[in-house]
Amino acid sequence: MPEQGGDAGPALALTATAFTHVGAVRARNEDTVAVDDWVMSQSMDQPTTLERTVTRPMVCLVADGLGGHTGGDVASRLVAERLAGRAGETADAAALADLLGAVDQALFAAMRERPALHGMGSTVAGLHVGPGGLAVFNVGDSRVYRIEPSGLTQLSTDDTPGPKLDDGRTAAYTTPLLTQSLGGWQDPEGIAPHVLREPAPGRYLLCSDGLTDRLDPGAIADHIDDDDVASVVALFEAAMAAGGDDNISIVLVRLRPA
């Protein structure tokens, strides 16, 4: 992501293969995936691949509505639509963090208007890409990985009460507890989004904990090859074979020179 007033870098081409599914146990899908202006929260039968030339800011993301809370599906959809619709307002990392804070407040405003939705919330993890560069962002425990020949590198930070690594990220730690989310039960006192500038081009995996709670990073990497659609299907099938007890959302993103 360029700093405000910075020069635009080389034009980028984006290819994203996206998939969201209710899983084997849950009654409804409370995840949402988005690529640019395409937003999907209905359980899918097969992945969808979208291509864009990055001539303006856009996002790719997964949002996971908080399970066990009222309106998780409403929350994740609102988060995805607001971030996708306002991606062009974020000229730098600070503006992206501010936008995430505004989406958090929009959830609390929606709860005040519709008391039946009190407590609804969502995680989010994604990429913000524009003509000048790339940023990784997240709130909650949905994840962003960079895919490399040697394996996966986690770029997002888990907002869970797990042990901290030397670089400040949270170690892999399966728990239903979150230290922050967008919306939720906590008072609307603001959030501290994680925003990380990342060099492009590259290949990235965005996913909800329906994948990462079932497969460790090594197992995830073992199911990824050069075919993005086949990789997404293999990851989904592995998560289902491991129980499929949560909604499962996966987005594979390739960024390359246009």
Labelled PLM ranges:
Residues 1-258:
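PP2C/PPM-type serine/threonine phosphatase catalytic domain
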